């Protein structure tokens, strides 16, 4: 039953069973049905498209919501309805997703779905005490997620079980499949040949309720990999180099498909690393063709039956031979990378596309005056926490004792899953890290998502850290805007941690050991997979077991809040809106809705809205969280100003520059302005996931036709957006700026809304339009 008991939401149904040891958690019947029909579906696609197919096209066209939709779609233009195979959610975004799902009135999820508790654990003292603290401090949220999961048939991975993307790779990802996840690094599953796409919670709700899931047909970027890696080069360096080529927005609305002989030289987890960080170039997803390395990984993780089924259709789990032979005829853009010539890269600071080969990095550090001393090395995260990653890093750590070296900086390690941690412990890797003074944190995101209680006396001090993470935006890891965060492979992080010097190049530089001798670090080495197999440890998986469970959302809770529908559009133009903020420069979802200490409010829209745009830089004063409040004629915080406007019935508008909403998939960055009565986001361009999230929540997201019009907007303007009565696909709207001196400017703006999305806008949100 689903209903309200007094003023509390109450849901009763199933209890939980705990899977101990090596238990099957994937959906074998679903996979058997999938592979049994795959060749037939591919045949139908070939008959319609009448040309050779890329791997991405094979997966996309075999996942159309209905067979009647099978036709040729124009990349980058046509919106298409899909039927993904599964959904994955992490605990910070699952709260809002499940609060929305509760309102959908369904008895169970329509596709296999899971929740993973990895974001709410703060890294501080180490795995044991940190998990204990998180379990207690987040008990209300964990209980809610666990019990709602039980009620609706969703698998639940407890705190400490692992990072969502590593757990998905180990248990759920399968070649040729399609999944969505409420995290921007969901494309990690592309390492097993899956189209895996990061989405907001409302999109996940569409899939979980069995509705069609809409996506603009992506363009295709083909990356031809030649040769094989050697020396210090790692899979991470492939994507670090590519980020420099494509920039943070170069992959927007595109799938990056890797092909060529070089792909077969990379492990499945190495492929996953590359796909994972494709999010940093804005790609819809990334994927690799099925090969022997994927088969071996599937078998090593207890999925021999899945490997056998994939083997049977392996010819259709890669691009057709004609595509590989003439890629520029089938991809919208082709990039070539020779793995045999690739050197390690270090990217940053403050943006993941500032790519520098290690041979040039010292010069860059000195030229820009970056803090040369490396203060902390951090390895792990969903991007680099596989067995192979830790194995190669441990081979560097072991050289400290062997070569009588001292370690100059602290090392923090976040294993990717309990399976990885337990196996690494058995095989001596954890001990190798502990011997050089490392702190082993929980199998969780930790510092990568800002959950790091860093030991420092001066939290605003200018300093440098190097991580094997994916993002390095200002304030992201430790809340310090002056922390220069650089991204590299785990091997390079270990080398720089030992040296304590950003200018150290392990490929050519020597270190001075405790005997005063010059010694060089050997090239890292490590096993792709454990020779004696994985050990699971305590996996921490809870499966819905069918008994009754009761859920309560206390109306006085500061962590959870039931959602009320957003109001529908009133049929009028948006007139005389004050400018809330004109954001200058990079404005990611971290700037719009900060993570770190704010993660605890991710299930409470009113409370989380207090952080809205507090990290955005005001173009008129160069400061953060300081905007002009026309009601008080003073400078105040962004959310506080928006709250005052809302209380007076005043709508407002936000103006921004390029790639607004880059980064995380968190839909809170769209729901917060919607909640605080911001009607319009006007930007030079949007990141894909965030633009979709804005549309889902009934916001108006428009872009400048002439980007120079951004400069016309003044601090005290009242802004009108007109033409909404005739809002239609491809039809521009008009913005009029009423300046304080009585003059005005007017210009047209464009949008990407289709008929269905315009329906969301008119209804007030996608949920309202159901």
Model regions and ranges:
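Mobile "lid/hinge" segments at catalytic clefts and subdomain interfaces of large enzymes
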Residues: 22, 26, 91, 174-308, ...
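Accessory "access/gating" subregions that flank catalytic or transport cores
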Residues: 132-136, 141, 146-150, 154-181, ...
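Extracellular/luminal Protease-associated
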Residues: 259-264, 647-686
């Amino acid at each position: 039953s689903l209903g309200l008991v007094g003023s509390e939401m109450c849901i009763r149904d199933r209890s939980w069973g705990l899977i101990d040891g090596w238990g099957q958690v994937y959906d074998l019947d679903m996979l058997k049905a999938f592979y049994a029909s795959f060749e037939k579906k591919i045949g139908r696609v070939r008959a319609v498209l009448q040309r050779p197919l890329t791997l991405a096209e094979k997966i996309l066209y075999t996942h159309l919501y209905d067979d009647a939709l099978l036709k040729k779609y124009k990349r980058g233009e046509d919106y298409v309805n899909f039927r993904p195979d599964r959904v994955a959610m992490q605990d910070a975004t699952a709260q809002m997703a499940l609060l929305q799902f509760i309102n959908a009135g369904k008895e169970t999820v329509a596709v296999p779905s899971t929740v993973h508790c990895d974001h709410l654990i703060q890294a501080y003292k180490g795995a044991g005490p940190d998990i204990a603290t998180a379990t207690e401090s987040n008990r209300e949220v964990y209980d809610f997620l666990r019990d709602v999961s039980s009620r609706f048939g969703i698998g639940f991975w407890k705190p400490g079980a692992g990072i969502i993307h590593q757990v998905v790779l180990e248990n759920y990802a399968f070649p040729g499949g399609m999944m969505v996840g409420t995290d921007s690094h969901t494309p990690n599953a592309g390492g097993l040949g899956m189209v895996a796409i990061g989405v907001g919670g409302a999109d996940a709700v569409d899939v979980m309720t069995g509705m069609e899931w809409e996506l603009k047909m992506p363009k295709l970027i083909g990356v031809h990999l030649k040769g094989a890696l050697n020396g210090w080069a790692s899979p991470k360096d492939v994507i670090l180099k590519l980020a420099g080529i494509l920039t943070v927005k170069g992959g927007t609305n595109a799938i990056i498909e890797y092909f060529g002989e070089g792909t077969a030289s990379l492990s499945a987890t190495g492929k996953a690393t590359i796909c994972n960080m494709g999010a940093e170039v804005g790609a819809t997803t990334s994927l690799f063709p099925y090969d022997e390395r994927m088969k071996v990984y599937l078998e090593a993780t207890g999925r021999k039956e899945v490997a056998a089924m994939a083997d049977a259709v392996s010819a259709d789990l890669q691009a057709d031979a004609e595509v590989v032979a003439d890629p520029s005829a089938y991809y919208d853009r082709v990039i070539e990378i020779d793995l045999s010539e690739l050197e390690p890269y270090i990217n940053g600071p403050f943006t993941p596309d500032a790519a520098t080969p290690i041979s040039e990095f010292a010069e860059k550090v000195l030229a820009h005056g970056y803090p040369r001393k490396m203060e902390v090395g951090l390895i792990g995260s969903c991007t680099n926490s596989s067995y192979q990653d830790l194995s190669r890093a441990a081979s560097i750590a072991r050289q400290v004792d062997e070569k009588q070296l001292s370690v100059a900086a602290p090392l923090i390690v976040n294993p990717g899953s309990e399976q990885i941690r337990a196996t690494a412990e058995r095989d001596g890797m954890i001990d190798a890290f502990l011997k050089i003074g490392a702190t082993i944190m929980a199998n969780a995101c930790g510092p990568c998502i800002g959950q790091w209680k860093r030991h420092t006396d001066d939290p605003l001090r200018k300093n440098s850290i190097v991580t094997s993470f994916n993002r390095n935006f200002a304030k992201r890891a430790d809340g310090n805007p002056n922390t220069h965060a650089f991204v590299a492979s785990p091997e390079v992080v270990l080398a720089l941690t030992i040296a304590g010097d950003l200018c150290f190049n392990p490929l050519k530089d020597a270190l001075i050991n405790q005997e005063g001798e010059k010694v060089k670090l050997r090239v890292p080495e490590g096993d792709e997979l454990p020779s004696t197999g994985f050990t699971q440890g305590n996996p921490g998986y809870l499966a819905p077991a069918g008994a009754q469970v009761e859920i309560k959302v206390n109306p006085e809770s500061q962590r959870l809040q039931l959602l009320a529908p957003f109001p529908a559009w009133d049929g009028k133009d948006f007139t005389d809106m004050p400018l809330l903020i004109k954001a200058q420069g990079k404005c990611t979802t971290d700037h719009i809705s900060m993570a770190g200490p704010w993660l605890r409010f991710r299930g409470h829209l009113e409370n989380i809205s207090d952080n809205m745009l507090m990290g955005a830089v005001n173009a008129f004063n160069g400061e953060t969280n300081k905007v002009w409040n026309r009601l008080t004629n003073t400078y105040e915080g962004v959310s506080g100003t928006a709250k005052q406007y809302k209380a007076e019935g005043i709508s407002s508008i936000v103006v921004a520059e390029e790639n607004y909403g880059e980064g995380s998939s968190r839909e809170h960055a769209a729901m917060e302005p919607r909640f605080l009565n911001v009607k319009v986001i006007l930007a030079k361009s949007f990141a894909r996931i965030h633009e979709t999230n804005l549309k889902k929540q009934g916001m108006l997201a428009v872009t400048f036709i002439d980007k120079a019009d951004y400069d016309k907007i003044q601090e005290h303007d009242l802004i009108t957006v007109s033409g909404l009565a005739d809002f239609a696909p491809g039809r521009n709207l008009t913005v009029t700026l009423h300046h304080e001196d009585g003059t005005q400017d007017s210009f047209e703006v464009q949008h990407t809304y289709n008929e269905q999305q315009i329906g969301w806008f008119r209804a007030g949100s996608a949920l309202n339009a159901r």
